[in-house]
Amino acid sequence: MHAYVYKSQRKQDTFVYLATRDDFSGLPAAVQAQLAPLTFVLDVALTPERRLAQADAATVREALGKHGFYLQLPKTIVLAGECDHD
């Protein structure tokens, strides 16, 4: 299975993987509105051996098969002193 990866120009470190290149029809309108414009960055074969930087390839394949897209959000980093310890 191939995935076509697009980077959000609005939200840093946010990527959309599509099952079909340039087919944003399965992406909810609210998500498109938050992330657009999206710029194509990569065509990747999602083989079982494939390692992705921030996502599990099997999870991406499953989402592409079910929904036609996978949304990769940036990792949240909590810095010391920024969280409330009760």
Curated annotation (Swiss-Prot):
Cited SUPFAM superfamilies: YcgL-like
InterPro entries: YcgL-like_sf (IPR038068), YcgL_dom (IPR027354)
Domain YcgL: 1-83
HAMAP family: UPF0745
Protein name according to UniProt: YcgL domain-containing protein XCV4171
Species this chain originates from: Xanthomonas euvesicatoria pv. vesicatoria (strain 85-10)
